[in-house]
């Protein structure tokens, strides 16, 4: 079974490094992913979080597009409730004009930060996703020219005027996103790294209820947290740092990503071990043999067309190596030479 692999990058800030380091590491990874044969490179949007550092993926994507040649680029995703659908459409049409047939627009409804930050980003008018379905419908209508006549943007010139369109994706971790994507006839990326329990049911419902739009067919990607290492010992050290991150998040601590050294030096009590055990099913960590086996099982369980790999490791070189090992294991360069 051929497996299509892509990259989701949250631009992590590792302890002891700066935001500038994190952005440079994203550019390094994008170039590597392009060379290795990954299908697409997505950047996530977050606000006010010390561990991740990309509040404006559309800006960073312009740079990534200029540094790469083949790989698709996109948002994973734009947090649409903050913005005008029309403006987001313009931004991604501009990216599509710069990089034809290479752009994905993935949208989500989460705030990408805490509620105080959300209100600051939205100038005090954050709507908590109440109008999100309407906004996604507007994007569909803007891109295919089917906005109703009574819509504010009907007949308004949408620029740049180009023949191609970004590929529109719905991002989600529940049946809400899956069913909305099915209703609108667009692609769906399920965040297994957020919700590992019911994803296969969401995937099944998405396919069953899909309504084709202009000949569209259901297409499902599962976004999975993965760390791949050369040895079990290295994998265990990297997982220790991930465990510390899990505890930090459970306690609501706004901190950089733990380094490998921090993970090695951290002692966990009974409560922390309980948190770690509860969260382990949301990640796949190990050697190439173990990781590929588990990814194949997950792909079959979801009947996924594609796997999108999120790797947040305790060092930037370890992150690069993880993607290298995966690409080798799945022979990506034979798929995308």
What are these regions (language model features)?
Residues 1-71:
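N-terminal beta1-alpha1-beta2 module of alpha/beta enzyme domains
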Residues 34-35, 61-69, 96-102, 182-183, ...:
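Acidic (Asp/Glu)-rich catalytic clusters
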Residues 5-9, 41-43, 73-75, 103-107, ...:
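Hydrophobic faces of well-ordered beta-strands that scaffold small-molecule active sites
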Residues 2, 6-19, 81-147, 188:
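Flexible, glycine-rich active-site loops centered on histidine and acidic residues
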Residues 5, 33, 37, 45, ...:
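Conserved, mostly hydrophobic/aromatic
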Residues 174-197, 202-203:
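A conserved active-site cap/scaffold subdomain adjacent to cofactor or substrate pockets
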């Amino acid at each position: 079974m051929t497996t299509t692999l892509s990259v989701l990058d949250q631009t992590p800030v590792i302890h002891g490094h700066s935001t500038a380091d994190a952005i440079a590491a994203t550019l390094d990874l994008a170039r590597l992913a392009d060379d290795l044969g990954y299908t697409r490179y997505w950047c996530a949007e977050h606000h006010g979080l010390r561990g991740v550092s990309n509040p404006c993926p559309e800006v960073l994507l312009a740079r990534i597009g200029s540094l790469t040649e083949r790989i698709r680029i996109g948002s994973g995703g734009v947090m649409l409730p903050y913005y005008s659908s029309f403006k987001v459409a313009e931004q991604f049409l501009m990216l599509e004009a710069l990089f034809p047939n290479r752009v994905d627009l993935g949208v989500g409804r989460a705030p990408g930060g805490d509620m105080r930050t959300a209100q600051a980003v939205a100038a005090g008018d954050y709507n908590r996703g109440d109008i999100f379905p309407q906004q996604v419908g507007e994007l569909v209508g803007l891109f295919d020219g089917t906005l109703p006549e009574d819509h504010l943007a009907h007949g308004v010139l949408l620029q740049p005027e180009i023949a191609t369109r970004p590929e529109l994706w719905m991002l989600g971790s529940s049946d809400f996103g899956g069913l909305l994507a099915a209703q609108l006839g667009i692609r769906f990326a399920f965040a297994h790294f957020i919700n590992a329990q019911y994803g296969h049911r969401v995937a099944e419902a998405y396919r069953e209820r899909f309504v084709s739009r202009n000949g569209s067919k259901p297409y499902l990607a599962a976004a999975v947290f993965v760390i791949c290492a050369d040895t079990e010992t290295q994998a265990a050290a990297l997982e220790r740092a991930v465990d510390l991150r899990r505890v930090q998040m459970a306690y609501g601590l706004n901190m950089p990503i733990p380094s490998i050294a921090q993970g090695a030096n951290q002692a966990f009590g009974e409560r922390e071990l309980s948190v770690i055990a509860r969260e382990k099913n949301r990640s796949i960590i190990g050697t190439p043999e173990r990781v590929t086996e588990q990814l194949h099982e997950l792909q079959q369980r979801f009947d996924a067309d594609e796997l999108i790999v999120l790797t947040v490791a305790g060092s930037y070189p370890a992150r690069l190596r993880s993607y290298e090992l995966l690409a080798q294991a799945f022979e990506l360069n034979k798929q995308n030479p």
